[in-house]
Structures are given as structure tokens and as C-alpha cells.
Amino acid sequence: MDCACATGGSCSCAGSCKCENCKCTSCKKSCCSCCPSECEKCGQGCVCKGGSSEKCSCCN
């Protein structure tokens, strides 16, 4: 799964995740997809490639 983000650092994904090219600004938690833009705790401008059940743990 390719997590395309506009700007920022990198997402830290779990070993089983296929997250590539993810450049969330502040989300460093394990995740399979970028945090959606409405997540205030995570980097803005990210595109969520997964379903609602695949949100980054830092969005909870």
C-alpha cells in the first residue's frame, strides 16, 4: 500500500504493513495508512488509503 503524503517526515509502520512513501508530518505511530486530514494530532495533508478501521493509532 502506498501512503502518499504532501509534506513532512515519515510514518513508522508495523513490520507487516506495506506502507511506502508516507510522509506524514507528525504521525510516528505504527499504521498501515496515513492519518486522515481531519486528525488534529497527526500531520495535515495526508491521504488515507485504508478504511476507517485502519486509522493510525495516534488518531484515537
UniProtKB/Swiss-Prot annotation:
Region named Beta: 1-28
GO BP terms in the entry: cellular response to cadmium ion; cellular response to copper ion; cellular response to zinc ion; detoxification of copper ion; intracellular zinc ion homeostasis
Molecular-function annotations in GO: metal ion binding
Region (Alpha) location: 29-60
Residues reported to bind a divalent metal cation 3: 13, 17, 22, 27
Any one cellular-component term (Gene Ontology): cytoplasm
Domain of life: Eukaryota
Residues given in the record as a divalent metal cation 1 binding sites: 3, 5, 19, 22
InterPro entries for this protein: Metalthion_dom_sf, Metalthion_dom_sf_vert, Metalthion_vert, Metalthion_vert_metal_BS
Residues that hold a divalent metal cation 2 according to the record: 5, 11, 13, 24
Keyword Metal-binding recorded: yes
UniProt binding sites for a divalent metal cation 4: 31-32, 42, 46
Residues at which a divalent metal cation 7 binds: 48, 56, 58-59
Annotated residues for binding of a divalent metal cation 5: 32, 34-35, 48
Entry text on domains: Class I metallothioneins contain 2 metal-binding domains: four divalent ions are chelated within cluster A of the alpha domain and are coordinated via cysteinyl thiolate bridges to 11 cysteine ligands. Cluster B, the corresponding region within the beta domain, can ligate three divalent ions to 9 cysteines.
Protein task: Metallothioneins have a high content of cysteine residues that bind various heavy metals.
Name of the featured protein: Metallothionein
Organism encoding this protein: Ambystoma mexicanum (Axolotl)
